[in-house]
């Protein structure tokens, strides 16, 4: 070997102690093509194998990483290297990639919030993850953290390799780029000249690499003495000041016509929230997280894609996790394997009616999910503790997600409910209880409720209450008739008619021997004539039996009396016949009334007929 190049160590991707995963944006999936599959990190320390949180994605270098192992930029390492070259008679090749530069590590730690294992690279537009890994192929990094389309963080597994890459792949941030380029060309020409001078000797002797030339030992000793006299290069004060300021250093080489600028990354170099949705690279070349779709992707489309991906993966794998996570084998899932799966066409517009019908059907099978969610949280914590040594935590998260989706309860399906739905259900129950209470109170107020103290303690009291109720009903029924008569008021001529009718039956009991006795006239003594005195006849027992007549009848009787005084005896007999006919008519009316008095519903009609009959008689 012409020079001692440090120690190369090959580290497998994903091997060793990997940091725990970070939370990524909703709907994002790792991709194998383009920008390589990400690995998450959650460490907040400056140790070589841990990454500061703030970036959501880590794109791992699957080709293998490079670890220096020792600090070759320290003064002690450079002196050891020179002594080894002197011992084995090696001549060191001078190149830009392997400069003996002493870098004070303690001085670099003075930079605020510095991450010595990470370099911030900007100007990576139109570059993919593989292009950046190819740029740092001499110092292969561990992974890349994309910040936006034009900048990213390149992370190594140790601080020494990152500082070597910064010093050897970038130049001083000054205007003397041309001078730096000329110096680089001069060094490369001198190294070529030295190789040409050494080629005849090596071809003639056919010595193997690593063997010592014994023909010219004096020449080798002179060369090593000259080399040892040359001290190792040190950074100039201006370059040290620029590194302390953490200024951007331009790269020596260009990639796809782009000049890269780099510096040590800080904890403030984080990915902004929603940077993936603003990425012009994804819009132009396609988003590998969503099947290589180009253009602007809506949030609803991303959610549907994510749900379709989970369903397709469940159907494809056909492995469902049981109730006990520890007994069943863990589900090994790699997101990169889903990229090559043929995508199903996703409809942008779905019928809302079908969704509403499905929701209505599922509402009948809703189960309260609060207790089961707490049980799942306990299982998740226990699974993370048990499977920390066997599987990655991102796989466990995905396993639990698959378990929640693919293993419903045997009787009823579980459904997640929002907090607003729970509040609404509580309000409904409160309203229902209030309505039932108010309805019960209203019914009781209408019907009336007896207290326990009012209930009789003996059967005799109950019988007495029944008797009182029946007596009150009878009184009310009897008072009903009188109430009707009171409302109708006193009928005209009714009292007199009743009096005459009550007196008239007494006349029947008398022995009737002749017409006069049948008409109600008293018998005359033998000494007097039949029509001796009209006044005595009118004032006799007939008027006493008939009672007092009304005023109109009195007037009529007075007129008839006057006529009787002036008229002959024939007129008196005609008057008696008229009075007899009137008495018969009234007797018939009384009989009819006595028959109809037993019908209470016809009392009004009877009163009307009697009143009309009295009017006609008058």
Curated annotation (Swiss-Prot):
GO BP, sorted A to Z: 7-methylguanosine mRNA capping; mRNA transport
Region (Disordered): 1-53, 170-250, 342-366, 426-618
Residue numbers covered by motif WLDD motif: 146-149
UniProt region (RNA recognition motif (RRM) domain), positions on chain: 117-178
Endpoints of the signal sequence: none
Quaternary structure (record): Component of an alternative cap-binding complex (CBC) composed of NCBP1/CBP80 and NCBP3.
Function: Associates with NCBP1/CBP80 to form an alternative cap-binding complex (CBC) which plays a key role in mRNA export. NCBP3 serves as adapter protein linking the capped RNAs (m7GpppG-capped RNA) to NCBP1/CBP80. Unlike the conventional CBC with NCBP2 which binds both small nuclear RNA (snRNA) and messenger (mRNA) and is involved in their export from the nucleus, the alternative CBC with NCBP3 does not bind snRNA and associates only with mRNA thereby playing a role in only mRNA export.
Protein name: Nuclear cap-binding protein subunit 3
């Amino acid at each position: 070997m012409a020079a001692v190049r440090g120690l190369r160590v090959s580290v497998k991707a994903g091997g060793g102690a990997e940091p725990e995963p970070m939370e990524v944006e909703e709907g994002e999936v790792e991709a194998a093509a383009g920008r390589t599959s990400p690995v998450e990190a959650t460490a907040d320390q400056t140790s070589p194998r841990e990454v500061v949180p703030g970036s959501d994605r880590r794109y791992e270098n699957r080709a293998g990483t490079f670890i220096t192992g020792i600090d070759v930029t320290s003064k002690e390492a450079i002196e050891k290297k020179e002594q080894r070259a002197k011992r084995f008679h090696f001549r060191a090749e001078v190149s830009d990639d392997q400069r003996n530069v002493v870098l004070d590590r303690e001085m670099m730690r003075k930079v605020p919030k510095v991450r010595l294992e990470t370099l911030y690279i900007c100007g990576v537009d139109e570059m993919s993850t593989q292009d950046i890994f190819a740029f740092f192929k001499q110092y292969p990094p561990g992974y890349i953290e994309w910040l936006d389309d034009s900048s990213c963080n390149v992370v190594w597994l140790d601080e020494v390799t990152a500082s070597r890459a910064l010093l050897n792949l970038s130049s001083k941030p000054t205007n003397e780029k041309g001078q730096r380029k000329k110096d680089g060309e001069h060094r490369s020409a001198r190294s070529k000249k030295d190789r040409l001078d050494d080629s005849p000797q090596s071809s003639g002797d056919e010595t193997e690499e690593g063997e010592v030339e014994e023909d010219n030992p004096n020449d080798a000793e002179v060369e090593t003495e000259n080399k040892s006299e040359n001290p190792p290069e040190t950074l100039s004060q201006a370059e040290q000041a620029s590194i302390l300021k953490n200024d951007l250093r331009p790269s020596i080489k260009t990639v796809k016509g782009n000049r890269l600028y780099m510096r040590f990354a800080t904890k403030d170099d984080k990915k902004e929230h929603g940077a993936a949705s603003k990425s012009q690279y994804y819009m132009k070349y396609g988003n590998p997280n969503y099947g290589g779709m180009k253009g602007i992707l809506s949030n609803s489309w991303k959610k549907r894609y994510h749900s379709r991906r989970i369903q397709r993966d469940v159907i494809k794998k056909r492995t469902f996790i049981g109730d006990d996570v520890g007994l069943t084998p863990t589900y090994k899932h790699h997101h990169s394997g889903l990229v090559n799966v043929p995508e199903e066409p996703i409809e942008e517009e779905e019928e809302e009616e079908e969704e509403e019908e499905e929701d209505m059907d599922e509402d009948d099978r809703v189960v309260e999910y609060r207790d089961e969610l707490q049980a799942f949280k306990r299982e998740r914590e226990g699974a993370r503790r048990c499977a920390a040594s066997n599987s990655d935590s991102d796989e466990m998260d995905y396993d639990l997600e698959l378990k929640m989706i693919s293993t419903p309860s045997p009787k009823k399906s579980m459904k997640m409910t929002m907090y607003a739905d729970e509040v609404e259900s509580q309000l409904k129950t409160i309203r229902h209880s209030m309505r039932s209470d108010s309805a019960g109170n209203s019914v009781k107020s209408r019907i009336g409720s007896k207290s326990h103290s009012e209930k009789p303690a003996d059967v005799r009291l109950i019988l007495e209450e029944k008797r009182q109720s029946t007596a009150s009903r009878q009184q009310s029924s009897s008072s009903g008739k009188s109430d009707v008569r009171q409302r109708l008021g006193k009928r005209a001529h009714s009292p007199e008619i009743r009096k005459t009718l009550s007196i008239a039956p007494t006349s029947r009991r008398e022995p009737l021997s002749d017409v006069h006795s049948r008409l109600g006239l008293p018998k005359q003594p033998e000494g007097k004539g039949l029509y001796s005195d009209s006044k005595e006849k009118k004032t006799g027992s007939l008027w006493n039996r008939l009672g007092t007549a009304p005023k109109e009848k009195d007037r009529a009787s007075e007129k008839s009396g006057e006529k009787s005084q002036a008229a002959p005896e024939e007129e008196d007999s005609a008057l008696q016949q008229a009075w007899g006919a009137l008495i018969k008519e009234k007797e018939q009316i009384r009989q009819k009334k006595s028959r109809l008095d037993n019908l209470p519903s016809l009392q009004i009609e009877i009163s009307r007929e009697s009143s009309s009959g009295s009017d006609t008689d008058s």
